[in-house]
A protein has these predicted regions:
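Divalent-metal-activated hydrolytic enzyme cores
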Residues: 2-67, 88-90, 99-111, 115-123, ...
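Short beta-strand segments
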Residues: 73-75, 96, 126-130, 213-218
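Catalytic core of membrane glycerolipid acyltransferases/transacylases, capturing the structured
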Residues: 78-98
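Conserved H-X4-D acyltransferase segment
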Residues: 66-76, 80-82
Length: 229
């Protein structure tokens, strides 16, 4: 059984256990690859205290259930998530995977759409890609990830097909970062197109119960941009 309380019993003696970045006292990151379970639980305690200070009553509200306004379909990239909207826990139902894909043959995707639209009654669906996406870069570099990553390679063939469809326009962009951003935008549009073909989405759109938005997050500035679809 996992102990959930003992690591936090003595906060005063705990601080020296933290494995923060030794090369930068002012690092923005809370944990590192060397952090222990104790560190993770201590940070959770700090987070709860911060939330109770800044948003009192939030946990009481969330304890009674959820009624999110938005379904967020984003990339699993560690540098962004729905919190870039400055929302609180309980506002956004999130679905994330590599390169923010909507897979019509995937049971997880289909059930997520049905649950968020039919049960939770979200009013917005956002597909949000981002700059400097590894899946996008891999496609543009025509890189072979090797046999050990065969499932990943198969997964990313959808990006490769999109790259091939848009290759003429992409090749007109000489700046590689801008080219990658453009393919990320194309990918957002593609996923929105796939969403609009799903029965549960079609029904909700016909009833004017939901809106679909496409966004791209800039990892180097924190700002979102609208993708015209």
């Amino acid at each position: 059984m996992v102990q959930t309380s003992s690591p936090l019993e003595d906060d005063h003696t705990h601080h020296h256990h933290h494995d923060f970045h030794t090369d930068a006292e002012d690092s923005p990151f809370a944990l590192t690859k060397q952090s222990s379970l104790r560190d993770y639980l201590y940070n959770n305690k700090l987070w709860v205290e911060k939330m109770n200070d800044h948003k009192p009553g939030l946990f009481d509200i969330n304890g009674k259930g959820q009624s999110p306004h938005t379904l967020w379909i984003g990339c699993s990239d560690s540098r962004y998530n729905e919190n870039v909207l400055n929302v609180s826990p309980g506002e956004v139902f999130a679905f994330k995977n590599i390169a923010n894909m909507v897979s019509i043959d995937d049971l997880t995707t289909k059930s997520t759409l049905e649950f968020s639209i039919n049960v939770l009654k979200v009013k917005k669906i956002i597909v949000c890609g981002h700059t400097d996406c590894g899946g996008i870069w891999n496609s543009l570099s025509y890189k072979d990830l090797g046999a050990a990553n065969s499932h990943l390679m198969d997964y990313l063939t959808r990006i490769d097909r999109l790259r091939d469809e848009k290759i003429d326009e992409l090749n007109k962009i000489s700046d590689l970062k801008l080219r990658a951003k453009r393919l990320a935008e194309f990918n957002v549009v593609k996923q929105l197109d796939i969403l609009r073909q799903q029965k549960v989405v079609i029904n909700a759109l016909n009833k004017e119960e939901i809106e679909l938005w496409g966004l791209v997050y800039n990892v180097d500035s924190g700002y979102l941009e609208v993708v015209e679809a």
